[in-house]
């Protein structure tokens, strides 16, 4: 499986933002047009990662923007944030999502999560489980506001039979450009044969290479791209090495 780099388009109140530790009040980047932002990234990358931050926190819904990105942008789109029912999964699939990232409900309601997986697989859509972890590598849910009561490795063991992959985010370095938590990557890839995407703290090409060497299927990058600290062309070269 070829290594992938996926730019993140995080949506809060209809705007594309970059946040520190997922906090909507701590913004390091803001744009009024998430669709145009996604379009710009699609010129370099085959996938776009769209997060409905409002939905993840139970504070809103940005379905219209998600739908426009899926329809207007020439890239595959993986969507996360607030997917807590089969009905919501169905809506996002109908909007054009190519992969869903599911977090909270996977830990809080086994039956609802199973229904989401069934709906996705019926449509040929992959489900990646979101593993958002703190500095102790414990999983957080509900927009990173609550402890799920399970460690990273135990969570992976729980979902290996039903998930298609994982998106592991090191929340404690998210948006800070202070380097990746390499142990998070190693623990994730060491606990599963499924593809693992990593996010959090990426500040340089070196960080991306470290994640790749640790076994990640790919990385999701936000802040470093938006701040111009990583050249998209260099990332293209890295992906093409495979």
Curated annotation (Swiss-Prot):
Active site, renumbered: 10 (proton acceptor), 132 (proton donor)
Top-level taxon of origin: Archaea
A biological process from GO: L-tryptophan biosynthetic process
Protein's cellular compartments: Cytoplasm
Principal cellular location given in the protein's record: cytoplasm
Cellular component aspect of the GO annotation: cytoplasm
UniProt xrefs under SUPFAM superfamilies: Ribulose-phoshate binding barrel (SSF51366)
Enzyme class: isomerase
Keywords (A to Z) from UniProt: Amino-acid biosynthesis, Cytoplasm, Histidine biosynthesis, Isomerase
Presence of keyword Ligase: no
Gene3D superfamilies tied to this protein: Aldolase class I
Pathway where this protein functions: Amino-acid biosynthesis; L-histidine biosynthesis; L-histidine from 5-phospho-alpha-D-ribose 1-diphosphate: step 4/9
GO molecular function (one): 1-(5-phosphoribosyl)-5-[(5-phosphoribosylamino)methylideneamino]imidazole-4-carboxamide isomerase activity
InterPro entries: Aldolase_TIM, His_biosynth, HisA_bact_arch, Isoase_HisA-like, Isoase_HisA-like_bact, RibuloseP-bd_barrel
Enzyme Commission number(s) of this protein: 5.3.1.16
Reactions listed under catalytic activity: 1-(5-phospho-beta-D-ribosyl)-5-[(5-phospho-beta-D-ribosylamino)methylideneamino]imidazole-4-carboxamide = 5-[(5-phospho-1-deoxy-D-ribulos-1-ylimino)methylamino]-1-(5-phospho-beta-D-ribosyl)imidazole-4-carboxamide
NCBIfam families per record: 1-(5-phosphoribosyl)-5-[(5-phosphoribosylamino)methylideneamino]imidazole-4-carboxamide isomerase
Similarity remark: Belongs to the HisA/HisF family.
Name of the protein this chain belongs to: 1-(5-phosphoribosyl)-5-[(5-phosphoribosylamino)methylideneamino] imidazole-4-carboxamide isomerase
């Amino acid at each position: 499986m070829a290594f992938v780099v996926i730019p993140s388009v995080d949506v809060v109140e209809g705007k594309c933002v970059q946040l520190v530790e997922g906090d909507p009040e701590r913004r390091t980047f803001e744009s009024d047009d998430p669709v145009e932002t996604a379009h710009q990234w699609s010129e370099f990358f085959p996938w776009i990662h769209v997060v409905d931050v409002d939905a993840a926190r139970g504070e809103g819904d940005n379905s219209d923007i998600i739908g426009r990105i899926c329809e207007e942008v020439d890239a595959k789109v993986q969507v996360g944030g607030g997917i807590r029912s089969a009905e919501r999964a169905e809506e996002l699939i109908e909007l054009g999502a190519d992969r869903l990232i599911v977090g909270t409900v996977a830990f809080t309601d086994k039956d609802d999560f199973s229904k989401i997986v069934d709906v996705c697989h019926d449509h040929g859509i992959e489900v990646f489980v979101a593993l958002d972890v703190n500095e102790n590598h414990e999983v957080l849910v509900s927009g990173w506001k609550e402890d799920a009561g399970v460690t990273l490795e135990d969570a992976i063991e729980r979902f290996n039979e039903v998930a298609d992959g994982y998106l592991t985010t090191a929340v404690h370095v998210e948006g800070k450009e202070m380097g990746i938590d390499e142990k998070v990557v190693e623990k994730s890839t060491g606990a599963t044969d499924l593809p693992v995407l990593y996010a959090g703290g990426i500040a340089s090409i070196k960080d991306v290479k470290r994640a790749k060497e640790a076994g990640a299927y790919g990385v999701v990058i936000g802040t470093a791209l938006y701040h111009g600290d990583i050249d998209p062309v260099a990332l293209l070269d890295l992906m093409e090495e495979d």
